[in-house]
Amino acid sequence: MEKKTFYITTPIYYPSDKLHIGHTYCTVATDAIARYKRLQGYDVMFLTGTDEHGQKIETKAEEAGMTPQAFVDRIVDGERGVRDLWKLMNISNDRFIRTTDDYHCAAVQKIFRKMYDNGDIYKGAYKGKYCTPCESFWTESQLVDGKCPDCGREVHDAEEEAYFFRLSKYADKVRHLLEDTDFLQPRSRVNEMVNNFIKPGLEDLCVSRTSFTWGIPVDFDPGHVVYVWVDELFNYCTALGLDNDRYHDFDKFWPADYHIVGKEIVRFHSIIWPAMLMSVDLPLPKHVYGHGWLVIDGGKMSKSKGNVVDPYVLAEMFGVDALRFFLLRTFPFGSDGNFSNELLISTINTDLANKLGNLVSRTTGMVEKYFGGALPAGREDAPEDCDLKKTVCALRDRYEAEMDKLQLQNGLDEIFRVIDRANKYIDETTPWTLGKDESRHIRLATVLYNLLETIRICTTLLTPVMPATCEKIFAKIGADETCRSWANANVWGVLPADAAIAKGENLFPRVDAEETLEKLNALQEAQRKAARPAVELEPYVAEEVDFDTFLKSDFRAVKIKNCEAVKKSDKLLKFTLDDGSGTDRIILSGIHQYYEPEQLIGKTAIAILNLPPRKMMGIPSCGMLISAVHKEKGEEKLHLMLIDDSVPAGAKLC
């Protein structure tokens, strides 16, 4: 019988920098869904890739002294790049697309021309607000505090000749799709899209640019490159063979069952994407699912904020499957989740070491201890076995109901309720007591077999989340391929009675939280520091100062006669200065973290003298010493402005 098909995609990621744990979260979740459908017997196509064109890539490449192609090649295919990350995380994608692939570029040109030929793309001029990092145009009303509503960065005015897509033409059809079907999930995203974009009125979309060249040329007007979101969105079709000869399974897998995307790009996938598909008369994807963000310290994790978490570090420290499990066990898939290293360690210790690992270790250890690694054939059932068997055999249906809704966390909750029940069953049946009585060994074998069957079924359902670990568990309990099937995940008694059992090493040793946190935090801080710009300067002041006003400021050379720390202050130094007037001047300055007092005695500095006195720690400060400040690798640096000692006290700067 021919298998049912299932097509699922991640967004294709923008390789302007290394990917972080937020990208990993999305890809691991999509991988788990793909593995779940394969377990059920579906013929799965799982696509991921990279979105490699656009102004931001062009700018970053120029800053790095590289061509755009070389720049993206390094991030995608280089050491510890995108492909290496997905290999490390055991991602089972069937296909990987790069939007710089020749077949994709040629197909996008054909698709763009189709929309032009049918009148849905026309030439005009664009004037509006543009966010370079997001490659997005915005109207004034869509800005939040004058900034990009997606990323919060500055926008700039952009005006250029451009091609436009008649998005407004499809507003009613898109609204119907959103409001009257289950196309967009979770349902909360529908209200966002309708209220924020549809109701205010969809404007036609700018779909070409002339201000940069790193993109797919419009073949009939080469001065234009195709807008990055047209280029990006059609990857889901070109990767199956639409308008190209590279692949030939578009008819087999399209439409997609699920596009899994972060909530910040739901607008493109739920409004623009279906409208463009309608334009070229292609079926719409069945579902778009907008998952939440991993937030850290209350804000979105992003490369620009410097608060990203490196998945390589976590996977190498805790193991790939532990990280995969944490991401899917801890955060509800449709909502934001607060990421912390403490939560990661707690989840590993509680769920993996104490619950799953302990169940497997205790059970296999007792089979080895009491029966040499293989149970005898006889069985002796007891009333207390019934509840465990009933709970275990009902697990698959409860798990399936949650997984089919993409509620991955809830699916794992169902499994761990059974694991908790199995650990309680051990306490109820006290197999260590049965082991002391030779006449109770058949009952002991029954208890241990019941535990092994529980482990088998739980492991089958955990496989999409922790594939490598589940292979190890199956090997420990002697479960062959038949024992691991979806069909047998609700059938009791499948594990052979005489299966070879081997305890082996513990699956998840407990993590020393204090020691590991100290090591991890130090490593992550070093990474963040290394990723910061070498030098950061304070923003330049745009407001001009009247020259006559500037001349009123009295800058003078001053000799430092004495310098001492101010009591009860960690920051303040008290300077006694010769300003040339014949009277000592006292100025306080908060630079103690940069200088010791004795370093500065006898030096010549610059001060502005005609500021009104200001009390600091009860001491009047009459003026201000001039310093230069900047940041190096995120650390603030300060240099007191010292000048040649031959300059006399009181000399005016001009």
Protein language model annotation of sequence segments:
Residues 123, 335, 343-381, 391-500, ...:
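Helix-rich, typically C-terminal accessory recognition domains appended to large enzymatic cores
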Residues 1-48, 103-107, 151, 158-369, ...:
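Structured secondary-structure scaffolds
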Residues 473-549:
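Intrinsic disorder at enzyme termini
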Residues 118-171, 175:
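Cys/His-rich short segments
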Residues 2-71, 97-112, 117, 134, ...:
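N-terminal catalytic cores of NTP/NDP-binding nucleotidyl/phosphoryl-transfer enzymes
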Residues 71-130:
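A broadly conserved sequence feature marking short terminus-proximal activation segments
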Residues 531-654:
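Phosphate-backbone binding interfaces of nucleic-acid-interacting proteins
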Residues 1-2, 36-43, 64-67, 88, ...:
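Secondary-structure transition/capping motifs at alpha-helix termini
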